[in-house]
Amino acid sequence: HPNALCAGSSEIYIWFKHIQQMYQFGPYGPNHATAGTFAFKRELLKTTKYQEEAALAEEKAFLKDYTIPFVQLEPKKTILVFSHIHNTFDKKKLLEQGENKVQKCSTRTVDEFIKQDDLKKFYSEEIDDLLKNYEPGDPKHKPDVLKQIVEIEERRKKHNQVNSNSRIILNNNGKDIELNN
């Protein structure tokens, strides 16, 4: 695309092995994508960069509040995320939120994403045992990530409290009617 400086996928799929279930996350917006799906022109680096201190959730700043000219990639051809013990962010925490408009169970299968049997076997059966013995990848060795996860969770909790306390009042012929958020 001639006008787009960056491409990526705002819709991603995560395979949760512990429950044998695929989940769809997103899409979140036309100029949004997960950093692991980015492909961008060198020209983009003249106007933006990753924040050195950001250990996760770096997309918003890099994409300048999602204003960078952008093209969406086909999710099935872009990435399949496997939830595992050394994920930078424990993907299982996402399931605690329950389903909503940007997070839902999917009928897609691992076979739709990965055609090679040896790769399917590696990601589905072998990776967890290998990661158990890979001490440097343990999240406890990523203090900056752990700190930022706590900060993000606190901001999200505060945001949810503020929004749950807000009320919308409709005045209908002199009678106030509270609308549910």
Q: What does each model-found stretch correspond to?
A:
Residues 2-5, 68, 76:
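Short, high-confidence coil segments that cap the C-terminus of an alpha-helix
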